[in-house]
């Protein structure tokens, strides 16, 4: 086994960002990849004009790549925010306005994974109130995902880089997954296992894989330290992905790493060109 046996997709919100958004799908295809994922591309608008949605849809289709993952609206990301769904007031309303927009866009491209970032803790607001709001919004998102045959992803981030984000361990994210599934009865909420974030939290990655592979709906990787390409840090990513496969995970692996100072297309030397197209 090894990297060549995985199904990789390129995150176009962190790779190829030296290019305009609409040029990134073709750049990923030119590098040999056949699948991409995105954070919500319109950070200032949960409900962009239909013409903007159509332009991105066309760029993805014209490039001949598959959209395999999409984030719901998450506030200013890139930026200080880490989601909107647990933020009382305007941000929660913006998330709700985005739910069907994101789900319909995903459905139009055959995308079957929607990621809902939880949101930062807000000073002066009871965490229990934020958690109640989060569950309400995640239930709505799970139902929208179910409507299009998709899974709803819940992601743990890392405390050093996201100190106000409450889900900074695998068990914390899994607890939310379980609460959402219990509330909806749909069973379509899944864990987004980001090996970079979990390693930054100091978690035992083999133990996390063994415990939670069955509840995992998507995996993302970057090396640590540095959040660079595999081989730039010290994480045994090839071994960890093999362990995931042996534990039963056969889904996508998102490349969510920083390309460094060189153009993104030069950051894939760790993966033979013939292994980049999904099989």
Swiss-Prot record:
Family annotation (Pfam families): AP_endonuc_2
Enzyme class: isomerase
Catalytic reaction equation(s): 3-hydroxypyruvate = 2-hydroxy-3-oxopropanoate
GO annotation terms (biological process): glyoxylate metabolic process
Gene3D superfamilies named in the record: Divalent-metal-dependent TIM barrel enzymes
Isomerase as UniProt keyword: yes
Active site: 155, 256
E.C. no: 5.3.1.22
Entry keywords, A to Z: Isomerase
GO molecular function: hydroxypyruvate isomerase activity
Region named Disordered: 260-279
InterPro entries found in the cross-reference section: HyI-like, Sugar_Epim/Isomerase, Xyl_isomerase-like_sf, Xyl_isomerase-like_TIM-brl
Entries under PANTHER family matching the protein: HYDROXYPYRUVATE ISOMERASE-RELATED, ISOMERASE
UniProt function note: Catalyzes the reversible isomerization between hydroxypyruvate and 2-hydroxy-3-oxopropanoate (also termed tartronate semialdehyde).
Family per similarity comment: Belongs to the hyi family.
Stated name of the protein: Putative hydroxypyruvate isomerase
Natural source organism: Streptomyces coelicolor (strain ATCC BAA-471 / A3(2) / M145)
Lineage of source species: Bacteria, Bacillati, Actinomycetota, Actinomycetes, Kitasatosporales
């Amino acid at each position: 086994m090894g990297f060549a046996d995985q199904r990789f997709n390129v995150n176009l919100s962190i790779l190829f960002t030296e290019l305009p958004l609409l040029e990134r799908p073709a750049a990923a295809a030119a590098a040999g990849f056949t699948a991409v994922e995105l954070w919500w591309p319109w950070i200032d608008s949960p409900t962009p004009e239909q013409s903007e949605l159509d332009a991105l849809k066309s760029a993805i289709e014209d490039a001949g790549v598959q959209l395999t993952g999409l984030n719901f609206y998450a506030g200013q990301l890139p930026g200080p925010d880490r989601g909107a769904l647990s933020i009382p007031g305007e941000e929660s309303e913006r998330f709700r306005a985005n739910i069907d927009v994101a789900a319909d866009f995903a459905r139009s491209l055959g995308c079957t994974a929607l990621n809902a970032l939880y949101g930062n803790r807000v000073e002066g607001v009871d965490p229990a109130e934020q958690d109640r709001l989060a569950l309400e919004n995640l239930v709505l998102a799970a139902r929208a995902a179910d409507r299009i045959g998709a899974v709803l992803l819940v992601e743990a981030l890392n405390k050093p880089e996201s100190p106000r984000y409450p889900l900074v361990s695998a068990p914390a994210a899994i607890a939310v997954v379980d609460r959402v599934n219990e509330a909806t009865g749909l069973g379509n909420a899944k864990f987004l296992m980001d090996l970079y974030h979990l390693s930054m939290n100091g978690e035992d990655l083999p133990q996390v894989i063994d415990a939670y592979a069955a509840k995992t709906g998507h995996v993302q990787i970057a090396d640590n330290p540095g959040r660079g390409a595999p081989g730039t840090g010290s994480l045994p990513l090839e071994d960890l992905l093999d362990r995931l496969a042996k534990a039963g995970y056969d889904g996508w692996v998102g490349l969510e790493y920083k390309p460094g100072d060189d153009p993104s297309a030069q950051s894939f030397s760790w993966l033979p060109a013939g292994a980049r197209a999904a099989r």
